[in-house]
Structure formats: C-alpha cells, structure tokens
Amino acid sequence: MILLTGGTGQVGRSLLALAQAQSLPLVAPTRDALDLADPRSIAAYLARQPWSAIVNAGAYTAVDQAEQDQQQAEAINAGAPGQLAAYCQDHAIPLLHLSTDYVFSGDKPSPYLETDATAPLGVYGQSKCKGETAILATACRAAIVRTAWVVSPYGKNFIKTMMRLAQQREEIQVVADQHGSPTGAPDLAQALLVILTRMLHDPQCPGGLYHATNHGETTWAGLARKVMQVSAQRGGPSARIVEIGTEAYPTAAKRPKNSRLNCDRLQQDWGITLRPWPLMVEDCVTALLNEQGAQS
C-alpha cells in the first residue's frame, strides 16, 4: 500500500482520481486518522501496516495565516516531512514530497533552478524550506518536487476565485507584477505518478530535487484574463480585469515577485514536460462550468 497525505487537497484529490484509474493502491487517511501536526499520530498511523511508498502532498498552505501560526506551520511543513523521511529511510521505501516556489525570494530575474540558493520571504516558505532540509538530512530515497500557482476544479484556488468574482462584479483588480507558471493539479499529479511508479519499480532510481509547473509563464492578471476569455467563450461569467501593483494589494506575508521555475531537469531525468498553461486553464474552466451547470 502507498500512503498519501493531503488527500483532500488539490493535488491529493487529483492523485487519488488518477491512482484509481491506474489501479494504484493509494491510501489517503483523514486528518483525524493522521494528523501531520502531531508526531505521535504520524507514528501510530505508520505502524498500522507495511507501506511500499509515501507521497507527502499534505501541507499547511495558508500563507498569510502562517505569519501568526508559525508553530503549526512548522510542525506540518517541517516536522512531519522529517519524520516521514526517517520512516522511509528505516524501511527502505521511496518518499515523494511536494514543495513550493515560496522557498525562493523571487528576486532572481530569470526562472529558478533547483541549484539556486533558497531565501524564503515568510513563515510558510521558511517552514517548507526546513521540510526539504529535513528530508535531505536523511539518507532516504526521496524525490522533492517544487511547484507553483496550483489551480484545479478542486478546493480553494485562484481560478475558482476569479470565476466566483466574475458572477458578482463587472471588473476585478488583479496583481500584474508577480510572474509565474500556473500549474494544474491534475497535470502535476500525472507527473508525480510517473516519478512514483518508476521509484517503486526501480530500487536504483535515486529521486532528487525537481521543479514542475505547466509550460510557459504569465502574471496573475494574465491568468485572470485567460480565465475570463475561456469562460466567456463557453457562456460562463466574465469580468474586465484591471491590472494593479503588488503594493495596491497588501497581504500579511510577502509574495515572491518571480515564481518562475526552470523545469528542464524534470524533462532531462524523467522525460516529463507539462503542457502549456493556457491549455490547462481551458480544461479547468470548462470543468468548473460543467460542474456549475450540473448543480443549477
């Protein structure tokens, strides 16, 4: 059996859907059964049965709230990955861990490489960075995959927010000076399963540190415009996008201005390239509109 944490999140739900289609034995416990903030809960759940691999998609992702809740963020994002990695090392099984662009400052003018120095701006990024360090401190066979700007038909995310606001407003102000690559959770899940499957079947496959986002780059405003375009084409709600600067939208945690991740290593080592982000957005918006139509 393969243990999946974070099964109710965007990537977790996408992984479960794909694993079911591929008959992969993924087990996703509820938070009551496995609390990543509680080392005793983690130890007790791990002891329930033998595991063939662990996929850690669980995280404390409330970026702004983390500034006031550092202890909880660090327990889930740093403590838990270290504990899971130690278990994987002791039992000689692979670990697949999801990380984030927030480990970087965003000051670099070009896309970030896996080898670039980390310099997180806030508590969330710091806690995720510590999680990576904790995993690498063990000798476990781990693949750490950093991603950014995750969206999907599931949970809370930027595309769903834009679609909701478009029903309520004629225009929406969106930040236009933060750059990144939107990543569809279903697309990312497909890539993660390729890595997981190979690590399961090839004990010599070492893992490593990788970046994975959909191909291409844009700004939050650019992403919002694409969402509105696709929605309007399909008869859904649409609003005019008004570009603003980061300073006009203050948040508790500072955001990286540059969240672009260079994904060349993923292609070189695994033969994986995620499709262009506009195609992903078309599928995501279409799925959301179909869901709304089914509910109305």
Describe the residue ranges of each PLM region:
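N-terminal Rossmann NAD(P)H-binding glycine-rich loop of SDR-like oxidoreductase domains
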Residues: 1-21
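Adenosine-cofactor binding site in Rossmann-like domains, unifying the SAM/SAH pocket
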Residues: 20-44
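Mid/C-terminal beta-alpha module of Rossmann-like enzyme folds, strongest
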Residues: 191, 198-250
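NAD(P)-dependent short-chain dehydrogenase/reductase
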Residues: 133-180, 186-194
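Active-site "gating" loop of Rossmann-like NAD(P)-dependent oxidoreductase/epimerase domains
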Residues: 60-63, 68, 101-121
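NAD(P)H-binding glycine-rich loop region in Rossmannoid oxidoreductase-like domains
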Residues: 39-76
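Amphipathic terminal alpha-helices
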Residues: 275-296
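NAD(P)-cofactor binding segment of oxidoreductase domains
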Residues: 68-96
